[in-house]
């Protein structure tokens, strides 16, 4: 079973890339984030195309912001929209969707950005993550928790850790919250597979960050131990970040039981740019966006 997660940063803008990508990579389960439209519009836009490809789907959206979806060719049952008992800002946002797919409880997540440390939104992010941990801990043994976590797990997951000092995504409380989630019995399967490699999933649109390979690894697939033992490949589909009109995030793909493309990775294709040796000015878009 192939499971993928992708922050598409507006599904309406990404349709010309999403559908060919589904045909090329043939994932069995896809978690999407940042739909930026309602579930009704999602269905009007993609419903027939997905059904023609054998996908059932569920979405939770809101106009212009946030939004998550799960597409599945291996069953889609027990759909739970929203983070049960989770906090709002001020109301619950379209950030979490769970369903059972092929016997695995799958969570598609768009974790709050946090915006600025010590802000109300930052506190909301930490409270949201604490509630997520409770939900996952109470869930079934076979689980995948994935999406845009808006946290780089370690300094190795940031192109220039010094550039992010004082910003969200890398603070100790955020990483502690992520580690508490992992302590529920989850494994960071990409990092497990590639413990010493430079791996990113997000590159700011500006300042040539993608071509310089100045990115962050904030899109994660976390798997419970029974599922993690089935992993045969785990990689970032960097090809989907190239070309015209991409999302600023690349899909992350995990293959269970069999690996159709072999044990490839960590980023496919690998970047041609050498790691930046000097300080690179940090674009602000990811830090101050509404997410």
Q: Residue spans of the language-model regions?
A:
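Active-site beta-strand/loop signature of hydrolases that rely on acidic residues for catalysis
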Residues: 3-7, 22-42, 106, 135-155, ...
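Metal-dependent phosphoesterases centered on the DNase I-like endonuclease/exonuclease/phosphatase
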Residues: 51-53, 128-218, 276
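Conserved beta strand-loop-helix elements of the APE1-like EEP
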Residues: 63-79, 197, 209-230, 256-257
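Short proline/glycine-enriched turn/loop segments at secondary-structure junctions
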Residues: 209-211, 240-246
